[in-house]
């Protein structure tokens, strides 16, 4: 079986970190031991610096929405070209904490950047490159932010008002419902049930991939 790129997506507080661990463990149980884990924005020395610019406050200067978008895509290109593609070429599976779907939801939905801009930039940065499987953890923004606040201090994006996250979720749902490579998981359930759903979805997908 060729190496695959699997991504975990969702709003703040959806449980992505736990989901990633479940995915990695399930892959290992299926004899897949060579796994590279990534996060976005970030994942390379330069991309982590760009991540800090996106996440941190900038007193006295407003970070423009389009600037935020360009920073995120710059970080993504660095990660895809320097880490993800080389790992896949070596036969390593890649499990990512966020990818392009996050930009479509947060900047396209939350920031309301024009769809034409989003599509053009995506095409320029990524071309036809996309994950083989995306597990989207769906959660009501209010519950997600409640969980996120429980983790401690919020970053610049996590401090956005609830309407921002409602728009982001709406876009997430549009994308999830229009792409067969996206599997939606109800992240409002207990951690035990979410874990079971992730394992089942991944196992079903692996069975299909093995048959091809």
Swiss-Prot record:
Keywords of this entry: ATP-binding, Kinase, Nucleotide biosynthesis, Nucleotide-binding, Transferase
Originating gene: tmk
Family: Belongs to the thymidylate kinase family.
Taxonomic lineage: Bacteria, Pseudomonadati, Pseudomonadota, Gammaproteobacteria, Vibrionales
Function of the protein: Phosphorylation of dTMP to form dTDP in both de novo and salvage pathways of dTTP synthesis.
Protein name from the UniProt record: Thymidylate kinase
Gene Ontology BP annotations: dTDP biosynthetic process; dTTP biosynthetic process; dUDP biosynthetic process
Molecular function as annotated in GO: ATP binding; dTMP kinase activity
Organism domain of life: Bacteria
Family matches, as SUPFAM superfamilies: P-loop containing nucleoside triphosphate hydrolases (SSF52540)
Catalytic activity: dTMP + ATP = dTDP + ADP
Enzyme class: transferase
EC number(s) recorded for this UniProt protein: 2.7.4.9
Pfam entry (one): Thymidylate_kin
NCBIfam families: DTMP_kinase (TIGR00041)
Sequence positions that bind ATP: 10-17
